[in-house]
Amino acid sequence: MKKVLLLLAVALLSLATSFKAQAIEDPNPKGTFVLGAQVGFLPGVGASVFGDYVLVDKWWKGHFTVGGELFFRHYGRTYAELDGYSYKYSYNDFAFAARATYGLNITSKFEVHAGVVTGVGFSRWGWKNVEGNHSHESQVGVCYGGLAGVRYFFTPSFGVTAEVQYSGYGPYTNVGVVFKM
């Protein structure tokens, strides 16, 4: 009996979700361009600017986008040892990446999205101790990873966004604004 009730509840929920999703007009038709700016945290602080172009719309209650992103991150730390010896280190990362996302339209104003990023990243790090010794190094590498986030639009062309992203070079958590053109 419990299995039958659970099956019935799941069927009704999926039917209600299907009817609600069909009633939502696609807020991101093909050809829409979304421009965003974000501030990032963890680790350190950073910023990113991205652009997404809607390539395919009305696909399984959502849309596919392709675009690009520039991001920067800085973080550092000071360590003090028990014997009084201390040192500082810092990292600066910059990357340019292509991104592709799938956005699921929950309502006409609210979207959940996930995607992938890949590109090239540049890092510079260094350390310095109290005696004046220091070292700096740089590297160039491939960045790749994934992202997941949400967007909420207050008007048809302005909204806010939050993303969790890992690419090896940029901030992991981002919040910002988006403009739909």
Model-derived features with residue positions:
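Cleavable N-terminal export/targeting peptides
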Residues: M1-P29
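Glycine- and aromatic-enriched membrane insertion/assembly motifs of diderm outer-membrane
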Residues: I24-T107
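Flexible, solvent-exposed coil segments and beta strand-coil junctions
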Residues: D26-F33, K128-N129, R151-F158, M181
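Transmembrane beta-strands of outer-membrane beta-barrel proteins
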Residues: F33-A37, G62-G68, F96, V112-T118, ...
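Extracellular loop and loop/strand-boundary signature of outer-membrane beta-barrel proteins
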Residues: G36, L82-K88, V130-H136, T161-E163
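Repeated loop/turn-to-beta-strand initiation elements of outer-membrane beta-barrel proteins
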Residues: K58-K61, S108-F110, Y152-V160
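Mid-chain, well-packed structural core segment of small domains
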Residues: L104-N105, K109-K128, E137
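Outer-membrane beta-barrel "beta-signal"
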Residues: G170-M181
